[in-house]
Regions:
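Glycine-rich phosphate-binding loop plus the immediately following alpha-helix
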Residues: 3-14, 160-206, 247-270, 390-404
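Conserved phosphate-binding catalytic cores of ATP/NTP-utilizing and phosphoryl-transfer enzymes
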Residues: 118-146, 334-354
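A short acidic Gly-Thr/Ser loop motif
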Residues: 145-154, 180-182, 293-297, 356-360, ...
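Gly/Thr-rich phosphate-binding beta-strand-loop-beta motif of the actin/hexokinase/Hsp70
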Residues: 1, 135-170, 341, 441-462
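Helical "lid/coupling" subdomains associated with nucleotide-phosphate turnover
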Residues: 193-194, 226-354, 390-393, 397-398, ...
């Protein structure tokens, strides 16, 4: 078993002397190009956006996140073909804050690329297995996994217990934010670098020079040096394409300023508090240890924040040394997800662990311009099913005969305003065949999980059957949500 790590970057390069042909450059090779308009970065972040599309000049059209994902998986499939000849079984890791349909979108893209997806893991859960100490000792533990990556913050609460020689690993809860290293980089650009060089950027824009992505690369380099080399301030320089060298500076104080302006501490404390409030039998004082992963964990702001929330007796930032973690466990914080996934699969196939997913979530729809919660997956009782929900016909028509579906991990009332604070995750849409419906009659919706764990959506209207009015299915839609670890 082996793992291969690459940046999720897709560069659409036009092949010279081959009219109309485009070569997809994926991963590390794509990082080296400076043809920014034809390059797509951080596709997982774009999968979280409701209607993301990006125009690619070399293609002459927009591309959607699912299409880019499939290109990346085709690249992986080709890499596997060169290394192994037997069936290509893979594990995919995904952010905690992905909805079930976003997970399905990635899963479908992998299958379309010819890959056999055997495991789907949350990134924070996979990261925990990168440490040998995660499955060690005789005592029961309740571990908080904090994984700050490039696009998302993923948090999982995991209970570990022993059953003879085997381990029982229970995922008790998860939460997260659509906030990661890329948001920090963009914040540094907007709040620190742009004000320092406003005139320069104005002149570059007037000359038609696309400087933004190059400056982001400089910011990433300076940020990594600040924390990996334990510097208080660092600098870098570049011509940015106009022939004049410009010097850039970044300090730790600058980074903290950005994080505070973004309200990061308050947002993280809020999702942690809401997670514990959703668990009737667990409080934060039950947590025995905290484990940090992800490139963002190098920024000492986050270890300090976790010490403040849990207390130094559970996690002391002064004892946290990311370089020691790299050395002892043989992998970096940045690659912990991939390495952990391999270790998890090995243990799973050897029969040494039993994994139980107890994470609850709730599904709902946009109804009367609000979120209406209509289906729960409860961590104790399993799945609940809905009765018939009457839709707002006028709203359905205004939305183009689609029903917008949302997911939340938060314990919230049945009906709440639609917000963009991250608590509601857009899942996708249920499209209705307009010609099948009598628009003078109400449309009804019922959601439930079938025996395979797939979500079924039944759309119905009242019809006369044997001289009686009955609610009869007009359409049935299925969404594959089963099998997620």
């Amino acid at each position: 078993m082996w793992w291969y790590l690459f940046p999720n970057i897709n560069y659409n390069r036009e092949i010279k002397n081959s009219k109309g042909n485009i070569e997809h450059i994926i991963g590390k090779s794509a990082l080296k190009n400076e043809d920014y308009p034809n390059t797509i970065k951080y596709i997982k972040k774009k999968l979280q956006q409701q209607n993301w599309k990006g125009f690619i000049p070399n293609l002459g059209r927009d591309v959607e996140a699912a299409e880019v994902s499939e290109d990346i998986f085709k690249f992986i499939s080709k890499q596997l073909d060169e290394r192994i000849k037997n069936e290509k079984e893979i594990a995919i890791t995904m952010p905690v804050c992905f909805s079930e349909l976003q997970k399905q979108c990635l899963y479908d893209a992998a299958v379309a690329a010819g890959l056999n997806v055997k495991y789907v893991l949350s990134e924070s859960f996979a990261a925990a297995f990168s440490q040998e100490s995660f499955l060690a000792g005789e005592e029961n533990r309740l571990s908080l996994i904090f994984d700050l990556g490039g696009a998302t913050l993923d948090i999982s609460l995991v209970k570990i217990s022993r059953e003879g020689e085997d381990f029982i690993v229970e995922e008790m809860a998860s939460t997260g934010l659509a906030y990661g290293g890329t948001d920090i980089d963009e914040g540094i650009l907007a709040e620190i670098i742009m004000p320092q060089h406003a005139e320069l950027f104005k002149n570059l824009t007037a000359k038609g020079i696309d400087y933004r992505k190059k400056v982001i690369e400089i910011i990433i380099s300076m940020k990594e040096r600040l924390y990996e080399d334990e510097e208080d301030e660092c600098d870098d320089s570049d011509t940015l394409g106009d022939g004049n060298m410009t010097e850039f500076r970044l300090s730790r104080e600058d980074v903290v300023q950005v994080l505070e302006k973004h309200g990061v501490k308050e947002r993280i404390f809020t999702v942690l508090e809401e997670m514990f409030e959703s668990l009737p039998d667990i409080i934060k004082e039950d947590v025995t240890d905290v484990r940090l992963f992800g490139g963002g964990s190098y920024i000492d702001y986050f270890p300090k924040l976790l010490t403040e929330f849990f207390g130094a007796e559970v996690f002391d930032y002064e004892d946290f040394d990311p370089t020691a973690l790299d050395r002892n466990d043989g992998n970096q914080l940045k690659t912990a997800v991939a390495a952990g996934a391999v270790r998890y699969i090995t243990a799973k196939e050897n029969g040494n662990i039993k994994v139980i997913n107890r994470i609850p979530f709730h599904l709902g729809i946009k109804n009367n311009n609000r979120f209406k919660r209509i289906l729960d997956r409860n961590r104790v009782w399993g799945n609940s099913n809905t009765g018939w929900v009457k839709l707002n016909n006028q709203e359905v028509q205004q939305d183009g005969f689609v029903i917008n579906l949302y997911q939340t991990f938060a314990n919230m009332p049945k009906i709440v305003p639609l917000t963009d604070d991250g608590s509601l995750i857009y899942m996708g849409k249920i499209s209705l065949e307009k010609g099948l419906y009598d628009l003078q009659k109400p449309i009804f919706l019922k959601l439930f999980f079938d025996n395979q764990g797939e979500l079924e959506a039944h759309l119905a209207q009242a019809k006369l059957v044997d001289e009686e009015n009955q609610i009869v299915d007009v359409e049935v839609k299925k969404f594959g949500l089963g099998g997620w670890s």
